């Protein structure tokens, strides 16, 4: 029972973690950009899917750094979706947990998210 409680506490801490904003505050000269948190290594580069390019969410406080990451995402084969400042990292991070669910349930680790824009 204790092991389960510890794991639940760890998951709860991850879900409310604000490490990105704390890092940005501790190191203001460094230009942090949050990206690649919702995909496995197998599909990080050239993520070919029949349904088209998957979407990678990113955020950060520096416009130039985000533009650089957006170019990397494009070169790697992703549709990029700018979610704003580093505050959005707290919303993006749980996507990693959601991404893991099919992996754990079905042992499939080659999936990605896609935003359908209208």
Feature-to-residue mapping (PLM):
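Rossmann-fold NAD(P)-binding glycine/threonine-rich loop
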Residues: 1-48
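A short, glycine/Asx- and small/polar-enriched loop/turn
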Residues: 50-52
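Active-site-lining helix/loop region of Rossmann-like oxidoreductase modules
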Residues: 54-118
């Amino acid at each position: 029972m204790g092991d389960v409680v510890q794991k639940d506490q760890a998951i709860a801490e991850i879900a409310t973690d604000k490490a990105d904003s704390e890092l940005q505050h501790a190191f203001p000269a460094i230009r942090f950009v949050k990206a690649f948190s919702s995909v496995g290594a197998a599909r990080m580069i050239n993520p070919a899917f029949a349904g088209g390019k998957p979407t990678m969410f990113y955020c950060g406080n520096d416009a130039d750094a985000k533009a650089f990451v957006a170019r990397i995402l494009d070169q790697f084969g992703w549709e990029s979706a700018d979610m704003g400042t580093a505050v959005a990292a707290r919303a993006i991070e749980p996507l990693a947990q959601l991404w893991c669910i099919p992996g754990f349930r079905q042992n499939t680790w080659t999936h990605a998210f896609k935003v359908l824009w209208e």
